[in-house]
Amino acid sequence: MGTGQPTLLEVDGLPDAEAPDIDQPLLSVLEAYLEDLISAQVTIHGRTYDAHGVPQRSTTVPALEQEGDDPVIAVLATRNAAVDDAFAMVARLTERHGLPDGWIVASTVDSWQGQTNTLTVAVHPLSGASGPDAFNSAFGRLAVTCTRATHGLLLVSRAGLDELLDNAPAVPGTPLGEPGTVELPRQTHRRILQTFARATQVV
């Protein structure tokens, strides 16, 4: 994430989830990563720009001292039930580390449209799903997930995204939201995942 390249972490060996959108085992892995990230006292490197978008000076700020209205970390999930668990996780992290109010937040992807944050940590919308459907494979929802962060993006998912997409039925249409009558969930998700650095953790 520190390089600015989006990263997908797939986690294998987890206990079964209660449902695709109620996955406490996966969120427990995510919470451990966030715990380490906050404890490491990372710094945020940036640039200031003039009114014409010309880069000015470089800045380096400890993440815990970052100022402004935007949160440093936004934890995003697709469905409301998953966000309820993410809210609880954010509350625990905030209390344990004495974080400023709003330093780390949780939200549904839909509610986070138009917002920005330093680092996005999101549960992939297809994680744990039996297959793509109109809701979890929507291109716009994935686009929001991938474009809210100014510095880094980490998607987490249960293992098996490639297999899920391989087994998804073909749908006629055009990929990546190009003009056409139907979007192609399988091709769209594959193209986007090809841009990610990928890692697998076995628990």
Give residue ranges: language-model regions.
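Conserved nucleotide-binding/hydrolysis micro-motifs of P-loop NTPases
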Residues: 80-83, 112, 126-128, 150, ...
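Conserved RecA-like helicase motor-core motifs
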Residues: 74, 92-108
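Conserved helicase/translocase motor-coupling segment
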Residues: 1-91
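Amphipathic coiled-coil/heptad-repeat helices and related helical stalk/stem segments
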Residues: 26, 30, 105, 138-141
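Helicase C-terminal subdomain and adjacent C-terminal extension
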Residues: 1, 94-96, 131-203
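Active-site lining segments that contact anionic ligands and/or coordinate catalytic metals
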Residues: 3-6, 70, 116-119, 150-151
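Conserved beta-strand segments of the P-loop GTPase G domain that flank and frequently precede/overlap
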Residues: 10, 76-78, 122-125, 155-157
